[in-house]
């Protein structure tokens, strides 16, 4: 193929293209084999894209704008998988032809139209698993779409690479699994396909064990991280969407600040191209970022009065100590509180957004130090933390960083590891060598909405059906690919569910506008809350095979970041089965509702009881809660003077990036629960634990 010195190659398409950037094999091979060409390669892939339909969140730059930004000389186009589910290869060929004609009529460099290379979809891999399709029907359709694409390429005189037949042969002749679900490539699969592509582009087989390949790939992945955060900039509604022009102190807008960050990322990305070129030549160098313009200075508006119901929405930059904050708490009768962990004990504990208990009984926390997203030129310090209490005294003894994860808005344990949101991706992380640090990292799903991080995928809860449920709020547009059906596009706020075993994904029910918090009770009844309005709902089946929501209780507070059902043999019996909602403005604490069941209709109603917890510390922001294996209630405190997302500039310097606490609430004079010790127990004993009356024990079993 015609690859020239200094070419800018842009990869576009669906998840096949999108996922390539995270493993970096294709660019690594091309840079290795064409060292001295100083290629600039940018990935514009997007899960769910079709050649004639590429939805984006409001304000996201157009495809042409981004191709111009990347100065595309060559376009690698990867379409066909999502279209194949419509079984209309003729219609696909028409759309592909129109796109080629339109693209060849443009220039993104000022020096003529781009050279186009069409890549067929890969084959569907039969993993021999009952969890996934065998791919026979998929491959019949994909073969048809491959033939249609080849015919279009011949007619329009553009390059064509047949990945379908080459991957089909490789899949059929190897015992190696190249995909995670039949269609989405793992690292081995991306390396395989990168080899096929590189050989087609170069005319020779790339050296898969080149002495510089590892250093090239390391540099490529670093560059791709910076480019990904530019092209797929999270919190895009503040970058280019409806809230980008919100004006704060001195008329400064989010647009002013965040578009400057995009410029910074352009420099950071280009600087790393030079590191790649040096690595290809066998030289080791570090990126020189001295040319990156400094960040825009932002002045806080924290001093401006903001009230809700006569109470201040904002706190103070003078933070109470954890002990002072506990002294400001009023608890329900018979309860007491102690500090489990804080930033004073563990500086890594900053902005805890969700907590959970693993099968060893250890508390985990997702901490979001970079909220609302990572800032260029600073450390990406969001984490999944483990906080073991080895001596069982109710205080964490140490902290372990399991993994660094950007924007970890929700997580749930599964299959010996943890599934965590890092929008737009859903990750599976696992430790396989026993050091409590993740050494497996798999993007198991892409296309989650990321336009507004503060209500992107959150509040993960493992359902009794084996699905992981989460909520997602407004402004976000998701476009998810699965092995089962065409891309699932949705801009609806509400509940979604994902089966980590089969990779089935579906929208569950609407919950406008800012959905946070989902939980299940002993009987499997399902509940959800909305942060903005503070409303709580029971999720019930309807007559059409779907689900609706009905009012669970009379809400009196807002906003609500989380909710849960109490299930503990330690806490007072009067609290057992009660529904608890957390609130972070005006009323700072936890509301408590007794759930009353109508066994005739199946409807559940919440009746307000004594507040579980209320604080007069204006920086107390309870974000999540969970019951530990000792039966105590653990409450994560965001601990921030600022709680509003849109009320302050995204980079307001009063947004705190240093504080975070976890408090432990116990019942005075009542024995703690005996830990179930789920980890490592044989299956017969785990089956017995499924009869345990405590929800958390059954879930962990």
What does each model-found stretch correspond to?
Residues 8-12, 40-45, 73-79, 115-120, ...:
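Structural recognition of the beta-strand scaffold that forms the well-ordered cores
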Residues 12, 22-24, 56-94, 124, ...:
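Oxyanion-hole/transition-state-stabilizing segment in secreted/luminal serine hydrolases
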Residues 43-58, 182:
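Acidic/histidine-rich helix-loop elements
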Residues 109-111, 295-689, 696-699:
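Beta-propeller domains with acidic blade repeats across secreted/periplasmic ectodomains
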Residues 126-163:
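Substrate-gating cap/lid alpha-helix
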Residues 4, 21, 177-317:
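Conserved catalytic region of serine esterases and O-acyltransferases that act on ester linkages
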Residues 1-46, 63-71, 75, 193:
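Serine-esterase "nucleophile elbow" of acetyl-processing enzymes
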Residues 104-115:
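A short helix->loop->beta-strand "cap" motif at the edges of active sites that frequently abuts
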């Amino acid at each position: 193929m015609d690859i020239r010195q200094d070419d800018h190659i842009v990869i576009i398409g669906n998840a096949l293209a999108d996922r390539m950037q995270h493993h970096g094999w294709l660019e690594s091979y091309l840079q290795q084999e064409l060292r001295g060409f100083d290629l600039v390669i940018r990935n514009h892939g997007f899960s769910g894209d079709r050649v004639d339909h590429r939805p984006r969140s409001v304000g996201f730059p157009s495809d042409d704008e981004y191709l111009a930004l990347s100065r595309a000389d060559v376009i690698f186009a990867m379409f066909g998988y999502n279209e194949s589910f419509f079984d209309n290869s003729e219609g696909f060929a028409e759309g592909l032809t129109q796109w080629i004609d339109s693209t060849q009529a443009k220039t993104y460099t000022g020096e003529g139209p781009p050279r186009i290379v069409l890549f067929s979809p890969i084959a569907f891999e039969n993993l021999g698993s009952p969890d996934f399709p065998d791919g026979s029907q998929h491959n019949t359709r994909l073969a048809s779409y491959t033939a249609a694409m080849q015919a279009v390429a011949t007619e329009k005189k553009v390059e064509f690479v047949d990945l379908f037949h080459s991957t089909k042969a490789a899949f059929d002749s190897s015992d190696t699994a190249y995909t995670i679900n039949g269609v989405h490539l793992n690292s081995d699969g991306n390396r395989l396909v990168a080899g096929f592509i590189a050989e087609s582009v170069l005319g020779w087989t790339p050296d898969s064990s080149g002495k510089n390949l590892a250093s090239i790939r390391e540099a490529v992945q670093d560059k791709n991280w910076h480019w990904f955060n530019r092209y797929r900039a999270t919190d895009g509604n503040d970058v280019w969407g409806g809230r980008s022009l919100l004006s704060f102190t001195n008329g400064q807008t989010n647009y002013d600040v965040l578009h400057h960050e995009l410029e910074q990322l352009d420099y950071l990305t280009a600087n790393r191209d030079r590191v790649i070129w040096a690595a290809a030549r066998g030289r080791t160098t570090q990126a020189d970022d001295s040319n990156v313009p400094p960040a825009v200075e932002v002045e806080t508006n924290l001093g401006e009065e903001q009230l809700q119901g006569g109470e201040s929405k904002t706190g103070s930059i003078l933070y109470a100590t954890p002990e002072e904050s506990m002294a400001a708490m009023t608890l329900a009768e018979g309860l007491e509180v102690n500090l489990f962990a804080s930033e004073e004990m563990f500086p890594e504990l900053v902005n805890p957004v969700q907590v959970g208990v693993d099968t060893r009984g250890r508390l985990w926390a997702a901490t979001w130090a970079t909220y609302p997203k990572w800032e260029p030129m600073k450390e990406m310090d969001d984490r999944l933390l483990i906080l073991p209490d080895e001596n069982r005294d109710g205080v964490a003894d140490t902290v372990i960083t399991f993994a660094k994860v950007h924007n970890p808005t929700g997580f749930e344990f599964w299959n010996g590891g943890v599934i965590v949101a890092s929008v737009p991706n859903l990750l599976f992380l696992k430790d396989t060598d026993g050091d409590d640090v993740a050494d497996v990292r798999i993007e198991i799903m892409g296309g989650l909405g990321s336009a507004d991080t503060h209500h992107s995928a959150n509040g993960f809860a493992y359902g009794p059906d084996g699905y992981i449920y989460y909520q997602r709020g407004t402004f976000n547009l998701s476009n998810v690919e699965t092995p089962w059906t065409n891309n699932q596009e949705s801009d609806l706020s509400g509940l979604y569910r994902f089966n980590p075993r089969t990779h089935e994904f579906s929208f569950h029910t609407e919950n406008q506008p800012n959905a946070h918090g989902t939980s299940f009770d002993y009987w499997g009844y399902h509940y959800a809350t909305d942060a903005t309005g503070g409303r709580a709902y029971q999720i019930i089946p309807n007559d059409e095979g779907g689900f609706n929501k009905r009012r669970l209780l009379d809400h009196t507070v807002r906003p609500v970041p989380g909710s849960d059902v109490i299930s503990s043999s330690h806490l007072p019996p009067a609290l057992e089965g009660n529904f608890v909602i957390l609130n972070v403005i005006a009323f700072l604490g936890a509301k408590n509702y007794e759930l009353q069941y109508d066994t005739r209709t199946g409807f559940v109603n919440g009746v307000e009881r004594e507040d579980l917890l209320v604080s007069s510390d204006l920086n107390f922001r309870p974000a999540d809660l969970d019951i530990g294996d000792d039966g105590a209630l653990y409450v994560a405190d965001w601990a921030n003077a600022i709680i509003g997302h849109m009320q302050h500039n995204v980079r307001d310097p009063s947004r705190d990036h240093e504080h975070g606490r976890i408090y432990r609430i116990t019942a005075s004079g009542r024995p703690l629960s005996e830990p179930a010790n789920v980890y490592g127990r044989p299956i017969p004993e785990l089956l017995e634990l499924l009869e345990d009356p405590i929800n958390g024990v059954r879930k962990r079993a």
